[in-house]
C-alpha cells in the first residue's frame, strides 16, 4: 500500500513517511491521533505525503465541532503551520484519493471552497459550491432540491427475507478453541488485533 490512515504512534508514522508512504492523521469521533502522528513527522521538510482526515465522525460531533475544519484546527493547535494544515486536508488529501480537480483554486478545478476570517479558527464566513455562493455567515442562501432515492430502484441490492438464525455465527472450532478478531480501544485509538 502507498497510503495509511491506521498509524497510531509517532514511530509508525515516521517509519511510513520515511518509506515514501502517504500518512493520514485522523481525528474521528472515536479515534484521535493527530497529535501523536504530527509529533512524529513534524521535522520533515516535505509534507506532500501528509494528510489530515476524519475517517468517521458522528453527526452530533459534526454539528457541534465541525468536520475537516475541526481536524485542521487540531493540527494547528499541535504546532502545524495553518497553511500546511489546510493543504494537508485539501490538496494533499485530494491527490491521495486521485481526485485531480479538487484541493486547490485553479483553472479546471471544482469551485468548491470556503472563505475564513481567521486561519487558526477556520470558521467559514462564505461557502461556495460549484462556483456559487451557497452560505454566508452561518446562513444557507441556496435553495435545497428535494431528491428522492426510492429503495426499490433498479440498482438496489435484493436480499431474501432474513430470520434470527441467519445472524448466528458458526465459527470453525479447532481443539475446542475459536480464533476471534477483536478491536481494542487504546485511549482514543482503535487497534485491530488477533
Regions found by a protein language model. Name each.
Residues 1, 44-46, 194:
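Catalytic pocket of metal/acid-base enzymes, prominently hydrolases
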Residues 60-79, 83-194:
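Active-site microenvironment of metallo-dependent hydrolases
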Residues 35-42:
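Distinct, well-ordered alpha-helical segments
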Residues 11-12:
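Short acidic active-site motifs
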Residues 1, 17, 76:
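Anion (oxyanion) recognition and catalysis
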Residues 4-8, 24-30, 46-66:
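Short acidic/histidine-rich active-site segments
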Amino acid at each position: 500500500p502507498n497510503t495509511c490512515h491506521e498509524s497510531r504512534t509517532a514511530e509508525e508514522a515516521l517509519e511510513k513517511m520515511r518509506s515514501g508512504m502517504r500518512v493520514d492523521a485522523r481525528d474521528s469521533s472515536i479515534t484521535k491521533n493527530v497529535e501523536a502522528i504530527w509529533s512524529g513527522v513534524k521535522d520533515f521538510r516535505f509534507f506532500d505525503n501528509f494528510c489530515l482526515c476524519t475517517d468517521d465522525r458522528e453527526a452530533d460531533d459534526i454539528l457541534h465541532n465541525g468536520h475537516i475544519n475541526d481536524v485542521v484546527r487540531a493540527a494547528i493547535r499541535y504546532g502545524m503551520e495553518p497553511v500546511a494544515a489546510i493543504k494537508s486536508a485539501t490538496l494533499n488529501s485530494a491527490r491521495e484519493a486521485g481526485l485531480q480537480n479538487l484541493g486547490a483554486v485553479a483553472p479546471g478545478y471544482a469551485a468548491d471552497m470556503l472563505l475564513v476570517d481567521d486561519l487558526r479558527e477556520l470558521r467559514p464566513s462564505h461557502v461556495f459550491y460549484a462556483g456559487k455562493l451557497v452560505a454566508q455567515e452561518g446562513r444557507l442562501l441556496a435553495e435545497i432540491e428535494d431528491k428522492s432515492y426510492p429503495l426499490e430502484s433498479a440498482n438496489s441490492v435484493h436480499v431474501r427475507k432474513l430470520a434470527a438464525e441467519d445472524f448466528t455465527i458458526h465459527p470453525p472450532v479447532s481443539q475446542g478453541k475459536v480464533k476471534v478478531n477483536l478491536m481494542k480501544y487504546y485511549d482514543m485509538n482503535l487497534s485491530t488485533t488477533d
